[in-house]
Amino acid sequence: MLFVTGLATLIALYASEYMSHDVGPGYCRFFAAFTLFVFSMSCLVMADNLVLLYLGWEGVGLCSYLLIGYFYKKPSAVAAAKKAFIVNRIGDLGLALGVWMAFVQFGTVEYAALFEKVGPFIEHAKAGRFDLIPWQVEAIALLLMVGAFGKSAQLPLYVWLPDAMEGPTPVSALIHAATMVTAGVYLVARMLPFFAVSEYALPIVAWVGCLTALLAATIGMAQFDIKRIMAYSTVSQLGYMFAGLGVLTAASSDPAAAAAGPYHVFTHAFFKALLFLSCGAVMHGFAGQLDLRKLSGVMFMPGWRIVGLGMLVGCLNLAGFPLITAGFFSKDMILAEAFVNPHMHAVGWLLLLTAGLTAYYTFRVFFRVFVGPQHFEPGDELHGHDDHSHDQHTTQHTAHSTHSDRAHDESASRGAHAHGHGDFHPHPPGWAINTVLAILSVGCFVAIVPYFVKWVPGIIEHSSAGLALVGGHGGEHTGAGHAHGTFLGFDPHAVMYYVSAVIGFVGIGVAFVLHYVGRTTAATSKADALLPVLGPIARWAQGKWFVDELYDAVIRVPLWVLAHVLHLIDKLLVDGLVNAAGAAPRAGGWGLRPTQQGQMHGYAAGMLAGVALLVLIGLMIVQ
């Protein structure tokens, strides 16, 4: 509740300036959906039963749909809203079935009663006797997991979140960085007893989180739209959180181990909101420009120092800069506990690789956009920001369309130069935006305090999660106790500080060399020299590994064809039979209509024909 309500207040203040262009019906519509979202999220967090949680869950889904599609006359925004809603339906179905099965199996949906009834199964799990646990309990955990993966954008249901950047930037900061997308992580943490007694749920959570983190990081490295880079970063960090829950709670009975995932939720809320709002300030001031190849040296332009410093603080936290950032400590906890679990070392190594990639793409944005030679080209929205004049703006604003070479050449021909673009002058953010960025920057450092005072472990120890900490779970479940893994022969808790620090420095250093050293223009960098070497890999990563295209080919197009075939069957066969039943008498009537002409000789001929027919039938019957 602390960061749901606190961050919502700050983002509302930010939005009061950011959305000031749209004072009128649009302004009211935005804040109506915004406040309804905060209510729904609060309902979700404060619920003491699964039904009330589900009510809040569906509420935030509805508000997300409304806010992503805020620019309802922009086709790409409408498509993104529908995509988010439909993909989340898959996860929500899993959650609904899980709630129903929990009620059928245990006769209640209240957390306290459910955890009391699942208590005996905890003992079976500790002993490694999963064969004594009913299959329905395993099914409940797996169904809840599907719901969590949908809402928190994990494989294979992550594709909706990057497209959700079509909504206004405050929406991205609140819903798709700080609160709603972490609802799935909250669900797993809240229902941890069910996951702890499941033989497969926690390992699946750990592996799906790990693979999602790595996949999203590779995509983020190759994007040029800074807002979408942060979106893929969010997907990646959510994967870290799930790995923290899947690996840490499975590896140790120590509440400090289980605290890593929830603590990363807490720290991530601050620095990712700061990053999104900093990107939004740039978008707001440069007419919607988000292409990192068309912006440079922003931090040193008049009026942009606070935005630049806020971005720097956010990047340091996301990259896990050692000792001074909350992001370092929360990420370090996850990495250490991944190696503590002797059965999850592969997950640990992949998370280490992801940490290095994260540091690289994070400072790729900072070095390209905020430092270096001063240069800017305004975006397509010279008359507004975030599609403020959406009544006229109907073109799709995606990374590929706005970053095309043709657009770059056309803008250059209109008078772009080293320090600007024609007569356009960027307008720095006002007091509301700067104040929010300053407060969030301070909050990123204050978020370190819970780590040292052991605040999160204390909460977990006295929560339902404390019941679910099963020693030795997540491996082979032998019931022989907890085996403590090592990192190259060393205690992970002792050395992971240094390992993660080195990984972070390497990522930042590579970004510094490739995107800052020797760069003379905004559009070029030393990284371009690697394209011939990385060729196909770079193209696939820039194409988001063509997952959307795969889903189109395997799921959307076949379903579209099937729907049209069924439509034709329904129209020609089903409707055809029904319509034929009415068409036959109508055709008979039209056929007999010429006999009704109002002439006596015609009627007489008809009567004679009828009498003759009756006589003929009578003779046939007699014979």
Identify the role of each PLM range.
Residues 1-4, 128-148, 347-355, 480-510:
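Hydrophobic alpha-helical transmembrane segments
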Residues 11-12, 217, 365, 507-517, ...:
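Alpha-helical transmembrane segments
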Residues 272-279, 356-368, 503-528:
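Hydrophobic alpha-helical membrane-embedded segments
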Residues 58:
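Short phosphate-coordinating micro-motif centered on Lys-Gly-acidic
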Residues 10-53, 62-425, 449:
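Hydrophobic transmembrane alpha-helices and their helix-loop junctions in integral membrane proteins
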Residues 181, 209, 312-315, 433-447, ...:
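Hydrophobic membrane-spanning alpha-helices of multi-pass integral membrane proteins
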Residues 91-106, 312-319, 436-459, 544, ...:
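Hydrophobic alpha-helical membrane-insertion segments
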